[in-house]
Curated annotation (Swiss-Prot):
One of its GO terms (biological process) is mitochondrial electron transport, cytochrome c to oxygen. Component of the cytochrome c oxidase, the last enzyme in the mitochondrial electron transport chain which drives oxidative phosphorylation. The respiratory chain contains 3 multisubunit complexes succinate dehydrogenase (complex II, CII), ubiquinol-cytochrome c oxidoreductase (cytochrome b-c1 complex, complex III, CIII) and cytochrome c oxidase (complex IV, CIV), that cooperate to transfer electrons derived from NADH and succinate to molecular oxygen, creating an electrochemical gradient over the inner membrane that drives transmembrane transport and the ATP synthase. Gene3D superfamilies: 1.10.287.70, Cytochrome c oxidase, subunit III, four-helix bundle (1.20.120.80). It is a multi-pass membrane protein. Residues 35-40, 106-128, 184-190, 257-261 are mitochondrial intermembrane. Keywords: Membrane, Mitochondrion, Mitochondrion inner membrane, Translocase, Transmembrane, Transmembrane helix. This is Cytochrome c oxidase subunit 3. Residues 1-15, 67-72, 153-155, 224-232 are mitochondrial matrix.
Length: 261
């Protein structure tokens, strides 16, 4: 390694952006093949290659930051800006789903029976599983904050306990959401109501799964003593992402489950 006189991390050539992009292509193509031709082969292949690429890329970043010391204050500042911009892009991503929902529900067309929910649709009761899911995510927001503060105070035991509680709540939320989908009386193909409901809540559910994976990675890293009280951006990014998922759910609950029913 040559001597450098700046604090920036000059990243080595990596194959993971290329394999990640190709796996994303397989994933989206596979999703269309599954929806239209009931053939999940390409989707499974896309999922596997995406998971492998993500794991390898994440592993390299952990090595660079933890063992090679590349994540200086300047690099961490850049990573923070990157995470903030990523979350802003996600806000606009979900904004599109809310736009589609309100566009369809505020002025229902004659094809929908001129009412919302459309004729023939039995919406889910917002005071049952959706309300429980809201409580779970709010509780997980409290526990992730507890975990973060414990880490900053150097309380390793409480940090691990709080993080495990957050992960358990995330898994519980996912299980309840899957049960809700299974028992729902309508599907994604039941007109604009089914489409907007399942796409919006489904993408949120996917974000919960990604966030839970992020937190599990942080738990493993904490068990391996990767984090210190003043050097833990990986965990901080996971906490930001989790809070974003919490806030999106509140808007989904109020809009689609409560007002939309």
């Amino acid at each position: 390694m040559t001597h450098q006189t700046h604090a920036y991390h000059m990243v080595n050539p990596s194959p993971w952006p290329l394999t990640g992009a190709l796996s994303a292509l397989l994933l989206t193509s596979g999703l269309m093949m599954w929806f239209h031709f009931n053939n999940p082969t390409l989707l499974v292949l896309g999922l596997l290659t995406n998971l492998i690429s993500s794991y390898q890329w994440w592993r390299d970043i952990v090595r660079e930051g933890t063992y090679q010391g590349h994540h200086t204050k300047v690099v961490q500042k850049g990573l923070r800006y990157g995470m903030v911009l990523f979350i802003i892009s996600e806000v606009f991503f979900f904004l599109g789903f809310f736009w589609a929902f309100y566009h369809s529900s505020l002025a229902p067309t004659p094809e929908l029976g001129g009412c919302w929910p459309p004729t023939g649709i039995s919406p889910l009761n917002p005071l049952e599983v959706p309300l429980l899911n809201t409580s779970i995510l709010l509780a997980s927001g409290v526990s992730i904050t507890w975990s973060h503060h414990s880490l900053m105070e150097g309380n390793r035991k409480q940090m691990i306990q709080a993080l495990m509680i957050t992960i358990a709540l995330g898994l519980y939320f996912t299980a309840l959401q899957a049960m809700e989908y299974y028992e729902s009386s309508f599907t994604i193909s039941d007109g604009v109501y089914g489409s907007t409901f399942f796409v919006a809540t489904g993408f949120h559910g996917l974000h919960v799964i990604i966030g839970t994976t992020f937190l599990i990675t942080c738990l493993l890293r904490q068990l391996l003593y990767h984090f210190t009280s003043n050097h833990h951006f990986g965990f901080e990014a996971a906490a930001w992402y989790w809070h974003f998922v919490d806030v999106v759910w509140l808007f989904l609950y109020v809009s689609i489950y409560w007002w939309g029913s």
